[in-house]
């Protein structure tokens, strides 16, 4: 969805703290004692809001708001600016609260995502009536409780069956300019009210990944209706974000050839999942030139994600001056060769298909030209005969500016020391590391020890996520995890070693170890 604060640059924390010092006698204004709380209340409200708006972690914003009742009331617009209801229980509890107990909170919501019956955990949950969810949102909108809503996304098991949801949001939420929905096994209604919006800034349509037994219910030739394209191409000239996504696991393949007809001067974010650019009357070769012209006509693009299907153009061939603002790219290994803006790309994702050792060596040659790269997500599939240390060392040496690495290895088990040794010998200073790998079933690792060893090897590490499975996998979004560990690296102990804490969640989704946010470390 489109960010309302895209134009803002982060305000340095040091500047915020210096402003706080001018208004309070106690530098440690956010500690938990009552005297500090009194000093905190003397800090100007606009400075507190500035701090909260520039904290990326929602839990830290909550911790800051819990400093005092005064601060909590001040930060309500920040706390509720973006609401993502990620489960049926969250949908039910939050919507009932907004309808009955706290109707005042709805006026702060600018971005709302509802995910009834979302399969996020392995624990069985009672199905939630999605019609009730839709009608609850209709009641909120018609009663004027969502006046500032700018972005709405529906992620249920099926598109809303009652079209009044979309017509009500369009009528009662004058600031709403970004909408989206997922699609279940039923066909898309061409006359849906979802396609009646005008002047959109963002639009999202995703296909639900369905169980195999549901495939028989899929339409034989699922098509995107003309009404959708008319809304986007003819009536949304100021479109900034477009996402049409189909999972690799889905047998549904949408024809997205008409996207090349769009001309959106403000388009910043384009994401095309595993869709097709070659229908019955055309081929992949015939679509390469129109699609390259389309990309060249959108110089404001900052984020681009392309699919991996054989029916989509495999190579990118663009003039040297094209895509000058591109900073984030996701696609195939073959795609990155033709990108005209390699030295300025900061985020790269190569997770559509696993890379062999031979293909990785080719990719590393390209990575060496990406001097600004700080975030890399990559999926490797190496055989048992591979020199894993050499592979990891070559990868790390090819992108020495990395601060975030998300590495998935779906081959036979390898020794962890091969990765830690490569990391120790490199110049990479990682801040976050996500590692997904296959492990022997008879050798379940101690993830805390692994995280501690990684933090010792790379002192800059602050967050480590470790995932392992006993079997290989075909798709990254369907890995049969045996265990997942999330770790935070705190300050060093007196002995010099890192203090690594596992991040565990209670039912309320708050961390066991978290305390009210303190800014004393910046002062």
What are these regions (language model features)?
Residues 1-61, 65-74, 87-104, 138, ...:
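Eukaryotic N-terminal targeting leaders
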Residues 4-6, 18-24, 34-37, 46-51, ...:
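Leucine-rich solenoid repeat modules
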Residues 36-132, 154-159, 184, 313, ...:
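Hydrophobic regular-secondary-structure patch
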Residues 119-344:
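Leucine-rich repeat
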